[in-house]
Amino acid sequence: VKNDKIKLVFIASLGTLLEWAEYTFYGYMATKLATLFFPTDNDSISLMKTFGIFASGYLMRPVGAYLFGRIGDLKSRSSALFWSMMLMGACGLGIGLLPTYQTIGFWAPLILLFFRLLQGISVGGEYNGAGIFLTEQFGPSHRCLAGSFISMASAFGMVFGGLGAYFVMLPDMPEWIWRVPFLLGSLSCFLGLWLRRSFLAASSVLASTLPPLNFKLFFKKFSRNFFIVFSIGALTGVFVYVNNVYFVVFLNKQVGLLKHEAILIVVFGEALAALLIPVFAWYADKTGPTKIYQFGLIMAVLFTPSIFWFAQYGDTTNLLVSQCIFAILNALISAPMVYLVVHLFPAHLRYRSISIAYSLGAGLFGGTAPMVAEYLQTQYEWIGGIFYPPGIYVCFFALVTWFIIRYNAAKIEYFKHPGQ
């Protein structure tokens, strides 16, 4: 039974790992992709356009959340996870083979946008769906730990995406090498499909036979819970993408590190976070996930600015301290997060409700976070020290989310059993 659980965690988490690896690789490669698909005389404009396409994928996540959420609620969790990974692999293959602007002109960024939109749809059904699936498979005493494996997979995905970008950015690499991680990711998706088809179907919680609520009744009963998941999605997206994807740009442009050096520093922080997440999740199962999550939010408000403050000095010691702070904050927020959102809705509405709410928050605010951070830093670059604008932007979201959780903690109706 233990081996089956390990296999279940690996196969369910694989899609999330690949999804975040590809998203992170695209974010880290924004400067390179800007020159290939948006060649202009102004590097900042090209970079903003590339981050804009990054954001467009996020904005399609609610569409995927509804489509795959409907499959997950009305058919089975495993079916939704299978088809979301299928779409993800096809899009990665398309981007990996896509000609650049120099070859096909304005069609290149248009086709890139098309694939990113489809990827956004696939992501809308993957991350939360995998978290729901795993949480429903484990007993009450380990559900926070079970959900944390999805957060850990996303962190390791960012590590692999970062390492891919690091090798691509090394001097003397051939021009076409940026395609390889996309193609390898696509191949991994198709291999993962075979594993999912043969294993997850045997473990899947079948959809409830209860009829779905109409929207009017749904928002009358669950509007509070929906808004909580929305805010958690927004905070998670902003925190991760400002302190990770944008942070590479910050280290490169503001601190003066070479791009591949900046990526390696951030990869260290993500790897440490991935290792800490299950530890904090295990502790959250013992003490209560809501307490751990609120504590993590307060720590994020207090210490996120110090991530930028230590990094500004540019020496190895301060950079590593910066990433240790990021890793601890990331793990505190990520460890209990999946458990919290999964238990806010009954089983027959869970996949759609969580995926749509989380995707809306992450799409509107997380997906646009690198673009907003770049804009704030450009407009207010005279502000430095402990008050770097991107760090303050993260603090604002952490504080707002803390108030929302704190105010509603005693008023939330939880659905603790998968069958409820």
Model-identified regions with their sequence ranges:
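Glycine-rich segments within core transmembrane alpha-helices of 12-TM secondary carriers
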Residues: 122, 144-166, 188, 355-369
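Cytoplasmic helix-loop-helix junction between adjacent transmembrane helices
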Residues: 109, 113-152
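C-terminal transmembrane helical hairpin of 12-TM major facilitator-type secondary transporters
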Residues: 290-336
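C-terminal ends and interior cores of transmembrane alpha-helices
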Residues: 86-105, 299-314
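Cytoplasmic membrane-interface "Motif A"-like loop-to-helix N-cap segments
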Residues: 74-86, 286-298
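Helix-to-loop junctions at the C-terminal end of transmembrane segments
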Residues: 63-76, 276-289
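Extracytoplasmic gate region of multi-pass secondary transporters
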Residues: 27, 224-273, 366-370
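Helix-loop-helix hairpin linking two adjacent transmembrane segments in secondary transporters
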Residues: 154-196
